[in-house]
Amino acid sequence: MKSCARLVFCLYFFVPFGRAEEVGEWWGTAEREREYYRITEIPIPSPLVIEAGAFATLPDGRIAIGTRRGDLFLCSGIDHRKPSPKFELFATGLDEIFGLAFRDGAFYVTQSCELTRITDQNGDGRADKFETVSDGWGYANYHEYAFGSKFDPQGNLFVALGLSNSYHSRALFRGWAMKITPQGKTIPIASGL
């Protein structure tokens, strides 16, 4: 019990002050991690707040960032040698983006209540068309998050629907994983999440 309390204390007070590179050094995994991942600190200008929940890499090299606050930003200027990012607001007013994929000029955004296709129809760099791809599940509590995937080879997306209460929900399909086909058909595929 005493060592558990010490661990919680250390995690609470010291981990937030560390950097990702230092954690790898501390664990002795930094050299191995560098074979797979490059960690680059990206400065975010004040007063911009980005509580990132999902990312997608665009064909032109920009990064799309979906946020818990419901914004979708496009970020350019990310270079590991000298990052000088530029953040552009593409869409706002969404609900806790925890899934983001990009295909054929459209963003597929997983929100708590639906999977939405978002496009820029007039080419001004801002979203102007929002289409519901699937809303085949319920939503009853602000803690009932939905987590989306990238596309599989057949063009399907998957959504994991969290529960706000243990083992039951009043909302349809909470605690399930859903498969959404390219045609928008929603298929429950696994329960007990």
What does each model-found stretch correspond to?
Residues M1-C4:
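N-terminal secretory signal peptides that target proteins for export/translocation
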Residues R6-P16:
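Bacterial N-terminal signal peptides
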Residues E21-L193:
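Beta-propeller blade termini and top-face loops
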